[in-house]
Amino acid sequence: MKITLTIVGYLLSALLMFAQKSGAYPAQDKLDFRYSPPEWQTAICLPDDPHKSLVDRSGELLYHYGQGGREFGTRISVRVKDAAVWVKQELHSPRVPIVRTYRRAEGLEITEEAFANTAIQPVKTPGAIVKRTDDGGILRNWAKPAATLDPSLRDIVVHMGGDIEYEVAVPKGSSRRIALALCEGYWNEAGKRIQVLSVEGTEKKTVDLVAEIGQNKAAAFWFDGRDTNSDGRISVQVDAAPNGSDKNTILSGLWVFALETKPDSEALLSGKLTSLSLADLHQAISDGPVRSDIILVSVKNTAAGERTFQPTLIVNTTLPLTFQPDQQRALIDNHEVVTASLKMKALKGEIETQRYIELESIKVPAGQTVRFFVQYYNGAASQAGSLNGPPNVGQALQCRERAVEFWEKKSKLPFDRVQLPDPGIQALMESSVRNIWQAREIKNGLPAFQVGPTCYRGLWIVDGAFLLESAAMLGAGDQARNGVAYELTVQKPDGRIESLTNDFWKENGIVLWTCVRHAQLTQDKVWLESVWPKLQLIAEYIKTLRRQTLLNNSPLDDGLNPAGTLDGGIGGTHDEYTNTLWNLTGLKSFIQAAHWLGKTDEAAKWQKEYDNFMLAFQKAVKRDMLKDLGGNTYLPALMGEDGTKQLPQRAQWAFCQAVYPGQIFSKEDALVAGMMAMLEATEREGMVYGTGWDATGIWNYFASFYAHAWLWQGNGFKAAQSLYAFGNHASPTLVWREEQSLKGANFRKVGDMPHNWASAEFIRLTIHLLALDRGNDLHLFEGLPTEWTHAGMITRLNGIATPFGALTMELKIAADGRSASLHVEPLSDPSCKNIIVHLDGWTKTSGEKVMKLDPRKDNEVKIPIR
């Protein structure tokens, strides 16, 4: 067995081992956000809202993600006093995303409350010929076409990871000549962005933008579209082709002409035909609802005398901005509107993209508070006057109260499925639920769960597996099903699942597991039978992958999976283990499902394949096992010599998931023991360090992968510690960034925020610490934190979905703290043999570590504690 590390790995590991021996991190027994990132952003949008409005740590409203060559193309804020100092930021409550930012200046206390106006209604726009129906955005000055071409070709509409969709209104059954333009401003090599252009009633056109057009060169494509289904609309769509590596779609121009207009691409691209068009891209409206967001500012005078101040509205945007004092508004990109309750007096300054609009001065008597607000509309400027936004401060206050009422009483989110005695963990649970529904959208009339509001605004196969599981656990399995069905839409004719890249082989195993777990949690064998032929094809493709390894030039992958993409810390294509681990997991889940459906012969057939697959894996493990500097044995994520060049902990996400939910190892497996010891040796701030994309940072929700592995191995105490460490890396507004730096280090961030795979993992881990299915038994309290067992505390699960039906149970600690009463309602599925209550670590027991309950009975038991 080799003992090897790179020089950097050696130094890092030595430092980490010393830190651990020196007691580098405190016990994680309370939630206090001690490792919160130094910057964050919080969603204030509504559930299923296509308008993903965010607020950052400073209180700025954030819009137009990715536009103008920066993270957010537009930022809107208010300055009351130049010398005001930021104090803190918090939410109205975990359920109510009103973000409160507190500042202090000499003699002044300033509170800014940012929230979405929940009462605003969509405004109908009659007569619009072109309507955009996807949820993508716009990027300005993205390409650099020739100066002789129409300047509008510099801009694109874009959909990150999705399709661009438009509708052209026509008399039913009629036709129009439609021109589309493309101009690639980013890639300079072929094969990157390949798009499929579709116009209803015509043949599709596939275009490799660089190979066929060139970088920063424009081309036009003409289609004679027809309303084939007589619904009064011609659909226009731009899809990413399967063989292109960049799945972000773009469109530089769209024009609608009468059929008699002669196609002339040169004239079109130079702008000479625009005046002849019936409509074009820039006249299109969005199909999304009109929204408004409010910053309500309260200024309290704590001084002895009257104070006068003059606020400033700051609009920082890369988009065109027009200040219209006669109409008392600022206009962004000719259609978005910013207004204020105070008079907008003058544009008093401009620094690059920042414009400073002077508002009228306000006098504040001693000891009194005055309020004003600014408001952002995402709707058309011509409609702003008809929107039912607040015209005065009194109505703005009413808007705030309506927002509170909406989130607390009308949002219908599954907040009440889990009740915990730790208010901090409860707060993160409720915020996680809310954020998952805020990131979600309605697409084609169905709910689509998404990872985040910005760079991860979409559903990926692996992220989606756990997002959809968490939704089903909370009783929203019917809503999650659309996401599960979506994962099957990327299946190819040969059975493979292909979404992220064409060698991300693990997507096959992930989809198998996702479908089986979803069917179990929703207790729906009929649905599982309906998709079974698709799952059979996936299993066959995993078998095909294994055969390919015996025919290629690499001896490292024999009997496993061909070289593929890892993700989660290591980029590129390699001989590696993450694909193998997940495809073993998927096959095991598929076999379990076959037994569940009574397909015993099929289960036996695939068990032989699985056993052979596992033998090949175990053989490779013996070849590639290494030791870290602490003597812990581990399997690197990369095979062969490449594995010696990475930090031991790098990209070990799939290993943890193979432990649980994969369950492909026995509890006694020496590989698991060594791997968990290796990962534990890297801990900083209670978290595994350097496993993600940032080798010197923390992948926040890896804490759940890690904790679930400990829990499955029987160490519930360690899993509970990880829950608190996970929570302490959230921001004070109860959200996570995907990855962040250690406290005090130069801050680097990776990924989206709020990141809702993190939200899903916090939900999954919290519930599984309390209730976890193992085979035909349901185990309770394997990871119950001892902090939740003090006098008077109540822990309750209310209708949580399990493979045995909905679980409702309550653990109530007596007022004197000496005993607990446990109530567990009957489970509906007869396949559950036992409910096993774990007593070790939190009860006064005489050698008994578990208690068995009958799952078919309504159980009421009293448990001595102290």
Locate predicted features:
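Terminal accessory carbohydrate-recognition/targeting modules of carbohydrate-active enzymes
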Residues: 19-133, 151-152, 161, 189, ...
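Active-site acid/base region of carbohydrate-active enzymes
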Residues: 335, 412-437, 461, 504-506, ...
